[in-house]
Amino acid sequence: MRWMSLRWPLSLITGCVLFFASIAAQAESGKLWSAGRYTFSDEMGGFTIIGVSGKGTRQDPIILTEEFHSTTPTVLIIRTEQTNLKDPAEDIGILFHMRVEVTNGSGHPWVEFGFELQEQLNVPSDYGDGLSFYQPGDKKDAIDSYGYASFSDDFEPYDRMIFRDGKIDPGENASFGFPIADFTPKRTFYLVQDPRIPSS
């Protein structure tokens, strides 16, 4: 019985090597999840993205499903290559809608949950940078939560929302819906997520 000799083109071999190398690099740095015009990453740790879907419109928001492993603030990195301005009336582009669905895997109850937008990491986002939870617009019925009954929003000297009047025990879920607008779009910005435990 004769064995057939297989000759693989060098380009095919090189392509396979690069493909598997890219997979390994992505696994090491943290997976990028895509939805709408954006990618989302948990590469800074403290939580894990389980899934992402949606386009970012009000009717079809970007739904981000996460599990939190601790009670320390975590950073979601949001990136886009499409920074061209669009009309906010189109309900997509520089204005998009998100729903964050979280599971408490920290082992501690959460009595509040905060979100803060930052254009530069660890630098408060003020009015001048154009990034906000749609600060100048009508947010009626655009911000809601399952798990907390109320929220407060602070726009200066930072863009922050804190959801209150509820408790998410270990193993339980909560969800938060809100718009994000960036009128001076950048390729990368950050969403700080802050589960809060009882003070005593």
Say what each PLM segment does.
Residues 26-97, 107, 118-128, 148-200:
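Membrane engagement elements in two modes
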Residues 139-146:
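Charged low-complexity interaction tracts in eukaryotic proteins
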Residues 108-112:
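Short acidic/proline- and small/hydrophobic-mixed sequence motifs that coincide with surface turns
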Residues 11-21:
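Bacterial N-terminal signal peptides
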Residues 100-102:
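Buried hydrophobic-core signal for structured, non-transmembrane domains
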